[in-house]
Amino acid sequence: MQHETKMENQSWLKKLARRLGPGHVVNLCFIVVLLFSTLLTWREVVVLEDAYISSQRNHLENVANALDKHLQYNVDKLIFLRNGMREALVAPLDFTSLRDAVTEFEQHRDEHAWKIELNRRRTLPVNGVSDALVSEGNLLSRENESLDNEITAALEVGYLLRLAHNSSSMVEQAMYVSRAGFYVSTQPTLFTRNVPTRYYGYVTQPWFIGHSQRENRHRAVRWFTSQPEHASNTEPQVTVSVPVDSNNYWYGVLGMSIPVRTMQQFLRNAIDKNLDGEYQLYDSKLRFLTSSNPDHPTGNIFDPRELALLAQAMEHDTRGGIRMDSRYVSWERLDHFDGVLVRVHTLSEGVRGDFGSISIALTLLWALFTTMLLISWYVIRRMVSNMYVLQSSLQWQAWHDTLTRLYNRGALFEKARPLAKLCQTHQHPFSVIQVDLDHFKAINDRFGHQAGDRVLSHAAGLISSSLRAQDVAGRVGGEEFCVILPGASLTEAAEVAERIRLKLNEKEMLIAKSTTIRISASLGVSSSEETGDYDFEQLQSLADRRLYLAKQAGRNRVFASDNA
């Protein structure tokens, strides 16, 4: 059993060796080299991509930090003003001017519009509306015991607002809007008749309504974006606001309005002029606010599908990046603004940059290496193929008879020995047939050697067509052939020999114009069944002796024993 397994393994290895010829080995080697070179290039591309993404995030982070610091400064001022307002509500200053302001408020509170002004150079005026107008608002109320303190606190905050407001700040307007029907603003109201309109414009804004105790339970700083109406000449603004509370009572809202154009200008100033890419600012609902591109402020606006992808990515982290077609979009949420800063870097900008140059060089190197590898593969593959064809041709010529295309004597003996050994191992019969054409010399002498060659080729074809798939035939001399039949008994071999004899004798062949001949053969058969001997040379010798017995008996017959 072990011997059978070993023979099967050897047969399998030989089949594999035949299939994996030199050409396949060359192909495999070049495929491995190409695969590893591509993997190395891909790894370099991955490292380069990581460096590119880190670079994009660093550039974005620098601008985001600069914008955040500026916005933080304004938020800190707003918190400072709220703290000052709370202190003034609890412990107002005991100044005569402030007491006079309270008295003046009591005198004018029923008027449709009124203004209380102490000193124009030091503080801001308090503008207000009547009790009747206040009573019409759902969120408005003057029914609080600290109304007088709120008036004086508003005047004190007006002093701080004047000091805090300057032209270099991003803030265009800072204001305190009270639920009690008055406001203080760094933007003056030129005519008193415009006070009601302006006040109701304040208290109907989201940045005021959004600070009710139901809307803003944590009483935190909030950001709001106001988009202008189509018929309005006003520009979009971002408002940061904070509620003013004391003793669990909501007095009003402190706010600062920042025009979007000033944020756009700040973005342009904060960007390195040598860097490509567009920076865009969005609010918390991903509504576009402004862009750093002065020529095309809406050049890279995202469509709804892209905005949905961006919003989905932002749900999981405060910063990140995503590829959209030929653009790489990096984003980072701001700490002191309820929004997100986005950087859009297009493919053309990336190609012009340092990473683009490195990528192009890397691609060209890979393409050059691959081209050289393919050329080398083609040359070597062609050379190996030609050598393999030449080797196969030489091997075939060394193993075969070129006239009959059967195995020659040496090849037949090489084939016969392992087959005989295999049959002996498996205890299968092993038979041999010797074939000799009758009167072949006469054909040569009468019709010439070319006719003799045709007869040999014709006979070889008929012999081959009479054999089984596992049988082997060869030409062992002049007009003499030998057939090896592994696994065939003496009787089966005799039947094959008879089939060969009949085929040879039945068919006439054309030798020359209008000349046909019919050939015959004498055949001798031997088998290992007779003596238990698997020696091929002995079996061939026995079959050869029986062949001559057939010739002596009159030719054109089969002898499978010495007595037949």
Curated annotation (Swiss-Prot):
Residue positions of the active site: 479
Observed phenotype of the null mutant: Deletion of the gene increases swimming motility and early biofilm formation. Disruption partially suppresses the reduced motility of a pdeH disruption; concomitant disruption of dosC, dgcE, dgcQ and dgcN completely restores motility, suggesting these 4 genes, together with the c-di-GMP phosphodiesterase PdeH, form a network that regulates cell motility by altering levels of c-di-GMP.
SUPFAM superfamilies: Nucleotide cyclase
Residues of the GGDEF domain: 428-563
Keyword Disulfide bond: no
Positions bound to substrate: 444, 449, 453
Cofactor note: Binds 1 Mg(2+) ion per monomer.
Uppermost EC category: transferase
GO cellular component labels: plasma membrane
Predominant place of localization: membrane
Site (Transition state stabilizer): 441
Source species, domain of life: Bacteria
The keyword Transferase belongs to this UniProt entry's keyword annotation: yes
Quaternary structure and partners: Homodimer.
Protein name (database record): Probable diguanylate cyclase DgcQ
Source organism per UniProt: Escherichia coli (strain K12)
Higher taxonomy: Bacteria, Pseudomonadati, Pseudomonadota, Gammaproteobacteria, Enterobacterales
Gene field: dgcQ
